[in-house]
Structure formats: C-alpha cells, structure tokens
C-alpha cells in the first residue's frame, strides 16, 4: 500500500491494518513520500483517531530503524512524556530520571528538544552541561555505570528527518507524539509515560503490551498534566503481567497535600534547570518543596515500575530519600562529567 492509497482510506474514515501501517511508515521513513503527503496523512490520522493497529505498526517501523543502544543492565526503565499538555511545567520526568538512578535504578532516558512546550528534556540537559552528542556506546556505559544515560532522539531516529518539516509546519499533536515514548533505542520494557489526555492511557498501555513491554504506567492528571500531579488525582493505565488495569493515583495517599502548581511553569531551559537544582539541593523554599514533591511522586512510580520497590508508596519513599540525601544531585553531576570525557 502506498501513501496515496493510505491517505484515501484514512480520509474516508477507515482504519489501516497493522501490516498496511508498516508499509506506509516504511515509505515515510525512507523518503518515498513527499512533505505534502506526510502532512496530509498525519492530519487525516489525527482527525480519524489513530487505531491500536496503526500505532503498533508505526512503532514497529521506528523501532526497527532506530540506532540501538545495547545495555547489559537489567530492568531498564524510562521516564518520559508525549508533551503537548500546554502546561509548560519544568522537566519533571527528566528530573525524576536522576532520582531513580540515585535509588539504584538504570534509566535509559529518551527525549528530544521542545516542539510545543518551553523546554524539552534535551534542552534542559544541554543547559546543565550534558553532552547530547555522546556516542551510543558512551550512553550505554553511562546507563550501566552512572545509572542514567540520555538518548537524544534525532541521533537515534535519523529516518525521522523526513517527517520533521511537516511536523514543525503543522504544529499539531500527531501520532509521532505517541511514538516517541514507545520507541526507546535501548529497548526498555519498563516505563512511566505521561500523556496529554486520559483517553490515551489504555490504548498506549495496550500497544506497549503488544510490543513486549513488561511493566508500564501511562499517566495523565485530572488537571491536564502529562505527569502525575500533586494538585489533583491522576488517571493511570498500568500494564503488568500482560494485563492492563486502570485506576486513580491521589497525591494525598502519598503524603502530598493538594499543592497548587504556581511557579512550576517555566519559559526556558535555564529556568527549568533552576527548579530542578533547587529541588535536588533540598532548598526549603515553598517553590523548591513543590518541585521536589512532584518529582518524588513521578520518580516513585518509576522506581516501582523498575522493580526496585514492591509498591508505588514504597517507591515514593525511596524517591524522597534520594532527593534529601543529595544523591540525585550527584547523579546529574556524574552524567555531565561522564559524557564530557
């Protein structure tokens, strides 16, 4: 099936099969489709709403074409989000990665520069001094030795270059927002993924189940964050042992009062880094305490998913210890040094 045939099908409101989506995405990723065709296809998919087969097929192609990072550590975990929630919060999932590493985990962090928000994970790590151009073998050794490594998406998904122009010009959420978190180059099978709408929680968990994931939490807060919130309950779809279960996570159950999010939105990578460093240093200001709380609840989920804790509640307690001990700050320092040797 070529992209013109696929476009006609999707515009008519019909879903593509998984195999058909594999064909079309292969054409897109190999430069066989024009920018106009790619843009039209992305918009048509969005308007129809992407099916499980379509998302699965597209993810399979991206995974196949990715430049892999081979890591020997067990129970790798990733903390990431689709973006697009419009909240412009500081980089919570990026900060959480260092907390998980400090708690004894191995985090294969996958991310990019910002497309729609003020700062992406790559932007804030670059501002901190992490070398985004580190070779795959350096990233692998960082994950194994430091406990966290960063995989800059464009360096590992070079075939994506054909879709970059249409994505930027459209400036809309597309299937690629979902695919990024599902195409980790290290092949992680354990993840906490934030999404921009609760409607995506179950579908993404089911797709990851099809793709072989072991333990995943897909989260979206009731106040619209692609993170677990400290200001409202969050909707969660958890994939574990091949079964998807949906439930709410209430911050009050983890010792967090319903704190507002005032001051946690940022306009630059430097501002985001400032909030992260404040939380990592244990600053006692209200703002740093709020930042630490939202980092802890998200890191706690990842610590649990990574198999380091028997429950999310235990994971949150471990995250708080990693923050208060200064170990999370040390992990950030170690990654900066490791990638700049």
UniProtKB/Swiss-Prot annotation:
Keyword Coiled coil among record annotations: no
Pathway involvement of the protein, from the record: Amino-acid biosynthesis; L-tryptophan biosynthesis; L-tryptophan from chorismate: step 2/5
Names of the cofactor(s): Mg(2+)
UniProt keyword Isomerase present: no
Gene3D superfamilies the UniProt entry points to: Nucleoside phosphorylase/phosphoribosyltransferase catalytic domain (3.40.1030.10), Transferase, Pyrimidine Nucleoside Phosphorylase, Chain C (1.20.970.10)
A cellular component annotation (GO) from this entry: cytosol
Reactions mediated catalytically: N-(5-phospho-beta-D-ribosyl)anthranilate + diphosphate = 5-phospho-alpha-D-ribose 1-diphosphate + anthranilate
Residues bound to Mg(2+) 1: 93, 227
Record-listed anthranilate 1 binding positions: 81, 112
Transmembrane segments: none
Domain of life per record: Bacteria
Ligand binding (5-phospho-alpha-D-ribose 1-diphosphate): 81, 84-85, 91-94, 109-117, 121
E.C. code: 2.4.2.18
Reported function: Catalyzes the transfer of the phosphoribosyl group of 5-phosphorylribose-1-pyrophosphate (PRPP) to anthranilate to yield N-(5'-phosphoribosyl)-anthranilate (PRA).
Similarity section: Belongs to the anthranilate phosphoribosyltransferase family.
Protein name: Anthranilate phosphoribosyltransferase
The organism of origin for this protein: Teredinibacter turnerae (strain ATCC 39867 / T7901)
């Amino acid at each position: 099936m070529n992209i013109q045939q696929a476009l006609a099908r999707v515009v008519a409101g019909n879903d593509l099969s998984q195999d058909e989506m594999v064909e079309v995405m292969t054409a897109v990723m190999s430069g066989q489709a024009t920018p106009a065709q790619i843009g039209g296809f992305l918009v048509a998919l969005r308007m129809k709403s992407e099916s499980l087969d379509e998302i699965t097929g597209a993810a399979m192609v991206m995974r196949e074409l990715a430049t892999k990072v081979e890591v020997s550590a067990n129970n790798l975990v990733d903390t990431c989000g689709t973006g697009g929630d419009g909240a412009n919060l500081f980089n919570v999932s990026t900060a959480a990665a260092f907390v998980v590493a400090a708690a004894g985990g191995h985090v294969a962090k996958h991310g990019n520069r910002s497309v729609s928000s003020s700062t992406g994970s790559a932007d804030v790590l670059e501002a901190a001094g992490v070398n985004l151009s580190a070779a795959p073998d350096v990233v692998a050794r960082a994950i194994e030795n430091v406990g966290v490594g960063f995989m800059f998406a464009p360096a590992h998904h070079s075939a994506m270059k054909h879709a970059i122009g249409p994505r930027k010009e459209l400036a809309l959420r597309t299937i690629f927002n979902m695919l990024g978190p599902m195409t980790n180059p290290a092949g992680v099978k354990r993840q906490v993924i934030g999404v921009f709408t609760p409607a995506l929680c179950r579908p993404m968990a089911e797709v990851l189940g099809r793709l072989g994931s072991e333990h995943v939490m897909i989260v979206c807060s009731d106040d619209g964050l692609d993170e677990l919130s400290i200001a409202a309950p969050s909707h969660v779809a958890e994939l574990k042992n091949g079964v998807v279960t949906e439930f709410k996570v209430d911050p009050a159950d983890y010792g967090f009062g319903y704190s507002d999010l005032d001051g946690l939105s940022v306009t630059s990578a430097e501002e985001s880094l400032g909030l992260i460093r404040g939380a990592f240093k244990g600053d006692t200001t209200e703002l740093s305490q709020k930042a630490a709380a939202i980092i802890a609840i998200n890191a706690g989920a990842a610590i649990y998913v990574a198999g380091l804790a028997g429950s999310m509640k235990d994971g949150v307690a471990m995250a708080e210890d990693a923050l208060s001990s200064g170990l999370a700050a040390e992990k950030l320092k170690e990654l900066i040094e490791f990638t700049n040797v």
